[in-house]
Structure formats: structure tokens, C-alpha cells
């Protein structure tokens, strides 16, 4: 090195390596309404019901810095939005109270309809029960259909190219390659069924 070792300053290093940035502005509009009340009763107590609806719109805008070299991250400008409409109902139904087989027994029900602008419509639900044979012991069980919808970046992120690396455990090396990341508006929500059981013991 004819210039010597360790003589480069930060300004020269920034010029050679390159520095890029992406300024992102996020905005969310939410309109929601809900109501709850009792629609009747069983011999164990009143039946409670809750209704809700919501509309959300997420808007994002990204402005990249210019002139960055490809290996420093070539960010692209983007401007997009994604909206969601939801409607839900929940109910709590008492089935027994002060009985010989149960100090209390309750059934909970819930359903939700969600319509995503890009991912389409999905339905989720939950059925649960809480049984207390005695006041100090409660058994709980829940069965539900759950989802995870793609987020804004996964759907609409602008193209971002740059140098990537991956570790190869067979050769113990980390080769580098040129790659590109971008959003995919055709992604669908992930779905899963969940079953849970548990108990709560509170000695008096």
C-alpha cells in the first residue's frame, strides 16, 4: 500500500464504501365501534354478547438517498397503502353455578371475519370453556383458528438490491452473492389451529 497502513480517514472510507438511507413515513387511520350487553340468561346467569367492527388503513412512503453503490444497498422509492375491514362477535354463556358437579361452568364463543385488501377474506374463531369444580380450582380449555396476515413490508416493500452472504456449514465458509429483496402482494395469511388446556389453583 503506497499510501501507508491505517491512514484513511472517515470521509475517504465513506466515499469508498458508500452510505445509503431510506426515510420511511408510516400513517394509520382507524375507525372502530363496539357494543356489548346481555341478550338473555340461563339458570346459571346472564348471557353476555359483544359486537365490534373496525376499518384500518395503513399508508407508507419511502424516500431513499441517491447515488448509493450497489454493494451498499440500492433502496427504491415506494408509496402504497393497505386496508383491512373486520367484524367480530363474542359471547359468554354460563352453564352451571353452585351445582353439585361445578361451582361454575362457562362457555365462551368468538368469531371474526376479516377482509384484507391484498390477502382476501379469512375467518377466525374460538371456543373455550372454564370449569371450576370448587372455588379454588379452575380447568380451562380453548380451541381456536388463528391467522397471521402479511405485514406491510412483506406485501409492498420496494425492491432492495445489495450484497448478501450465507454461512455454509459443510465448508465452514461464508460466500457472498448479489441479491434482491422485494414485497409480494400475492401473499396469503398463515393459518393455524390451536388447542390449549390448563388449570388455575388458588388455595384459600
Describe the residue ranges of each PLM region:
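Solvent-exposed loop/turn segments connecting transmembrane beta-strands
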Residues: 81-84, 114-123
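Surface-exposed, low-complexity loop segments enriched in small/polar and acidic residues
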Residues: 1-85, 98-100, 144-189
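Sequence-level detector for tyrosine residue identity
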Residues: 15, 55, 116-118, 125, ...
Amino acid at each position: 500500500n503506497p499510501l501507508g497502513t491505517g491512514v484513511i480517514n472517515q470521509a475517504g472510507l465513506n466515499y469508498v464504501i458508500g452510505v445509503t438511507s431510506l426515510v420511511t413515513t408510516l400513517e394509520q387511520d382507524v375507525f372502530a365501534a363496539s357494543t356489548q350487553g346481555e341478550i338473555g340468561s340461563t339458570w346459571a346467569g346472564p348471557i353476555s354478547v359483544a359486537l365490534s367492527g373496525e376499518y384500518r388503513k395503513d399508508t407508507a412512503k419511502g424516500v431513499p438517498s441517491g447515488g448509493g453503490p450497489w454493494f451498499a444497498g440500492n433502496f427504491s422509492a415506494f408509496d402504497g397503502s393497505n386496508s383491512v375491514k373486520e367484524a367480530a362477535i363474542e359471547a359468554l354463556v354460563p352453564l352451571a353455578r353452585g351445582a353439585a358437579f361445578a361451582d361454575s361452568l362457562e362457555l365462551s364463543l368468538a368469531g371474526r371475519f376479516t377482509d384484507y385488501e391484498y390477502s382476501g377474506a379469512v375467518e377466525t374463531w374460538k371456543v373455550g370453556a372454564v370449569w371450576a369444580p370448587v372455588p379454588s380450582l379452575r380447568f380451562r380449555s380453548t380451541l381456536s383458528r388463528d391467522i397471521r396476515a402479511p405485514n406491510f413490508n412483506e406485501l409492498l416493500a420496494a425492491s432492495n438490491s445489495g450484497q448478501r452472504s450465507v454461512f455454509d456449514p459443510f465448508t465452514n465458509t461464508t460466500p457472498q452473492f448479489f441479491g434482491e429483496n422485494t414485497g409480494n402482494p400475492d401473499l396469503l395469511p398463515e393459518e393455524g389451529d390451536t388447542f390449549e388446556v390448563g388449570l388455575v389453583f388458588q388455595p384459600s
